[in-house]
Amino acid sequence: SDACIIDNSGNFMFESYIKQRNSYVSFWANVYKFSFLGCCYAFKRKILDIAIPFPPNHKLCTHDNWIFLIAASSFSYKIIPEKLICYRRHLGNTSTGGLKNNTSLYFKMKYRIYLIWHLLKRKLEFRL
């Protein structure tokens, strides 16, 4: 689902995360630029059964993106436009919450290669 983005004080920063992020629906577009917040996911148990255990390096594989990759690569999924939550951006948040980040191109490539490698291994393991 979509979400509004609010600041520490509860003031609206963005009315729509999906619009702010220019979110894409396709699998490969999301590998290029992950477009959704994990706190807005709803998924069936069978996806979690495949996703767990998460790949070991949590800096190169966030659980949000991992669950999305498992779901999008092997199952059908739907994005609903309703804003079901307001996502609060704290100054110390780990994720950027859709805002620009300063990670290097090297890190972005390493991150995606790590995710795809583990995704391929998992798909072979579960014969997906």
For each feature predicted by the language model, list its residue ranges.
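Hydrophobic alpha-helical membrane context
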Residues: F14, S76, K100-N102
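Conserved donor NDP-sugar-binding/catalytic core segment of glycosyltransferases
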Residues: S1-M13
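Catalytic core of nucleotide-sugar-dependent glycosyltransferases
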Residues: K19-V31, Y87-L91, T96-L128
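Short, flexible, mixed-charge acidic loops at enzyme active sites
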Residues: F12-Q20
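Conserved nucleotide-sugar donor-binding catalytic segment
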Residues: N22-G98
